[in-house]
Amino acid sequence: MPYVTVGQENSATIDIYYEDLGAGQPIVLIHGFPLNGDSWEKQVLVLLNAGYRVITYDRRGFGASSQPSSGYDYDTFAADLHTLMTKLDLQNTVLVGFSMGTGEVTRYLGKYGSERVQKAVLMAPVPPFLLKTNDNPEGVDQSVFDGIMKAIVDDRPAYFSAFFKEFFNVDVLLGERISNEAIQASWNVAAGASAKGTLDCVPSWLTDFRDDLPRIDVPTLIIHGDADRILPLESTAARLPKRIKNSQLEIIPGGPHAINWTHADQVNPLLLNFLQ
């Protein structure tokens, strides 16, 4: 199993698990919370068939990567991505983030620039800024995130069960675009994640990306479902085209948060067309 070492805690190294498949222009897929690189299954198959080199990796604390007690912030997440990009010497890369993974894409480009990056894709994005403040009235009250953290501490497995119902819009899409088996598979991955990492990721969602967005200087595709209950369109993606030059927003009608799974039949053609 391939790993890249990104740090050390006490006597143990902090290692990021990745998969590097195929040949051609590199596409780096960055997963959402609380999943791992396997959540890109429906995109990996299509991208490999289209002749791309596809790299997935597990964020620290999740999947097969190390589960350290710290580093669950976007400066560290972006540094982990930078280490991977440097080790693999990726050039002309397309960075594709889903949900929490869009934070890595945004902070990476804001901090490290686009020397290694040709294009970017933000699916169901976290940016620009989730927290409601005086200068960000479109955000969400802090009390909502406090409630999430309490639910994780009280009963993390039960929190995941409730989370995935809204993640996939189960009440509407079960049996049509999502199966019980797929939901259970996602729950299993989430349950295996770091308890500390799961909790510490919540404050990271409140990162203010507004200064990073104008620094994105590559063509950027934004995709969002108009029925997203986790990150509503109006608070997130709808605010990005004015902040990212050379960007385009594509809206998936009826799409929940997990559009890369439930609406892969619509997401994948948009992705392939943008890559060409």
Swiss-Prot record:
Matching Gene3D superfamilies: alpha/beta hydrolase
Any Pfam family matching the protein: Abhydrolase_1
GO molecular function, one term: chloride peroxidase activity
Tagged with keyword Oxidoreductase: yes
Regions that span the bilayer: none
Coiled coil: none
Descriptive protein name: Putative non-heme chloroperoxidase
Organism: Synechocystis sp. (strain ATCC 27184 / PCC 6803 / Kazusa)
Family: Belongs to the AB hydrolase superfamily. Bacterial non-heme haloperoxidase / perhydrolase family.
Sorted UniProt keywords: Chloride, Oxidoreductase, Peroxidase
EC number: 1.11.1.-
Highest rank taxon of the organism: Bacteria
UniProt xrefs under InterPro entries: AB_hydrolase, AB_hydrolase_1, AB_hydrolase_fold, Epox_hydrolase-like
Limits of the AB hydrolase-1 domain: 26-263
Active site: S99, D228, H257
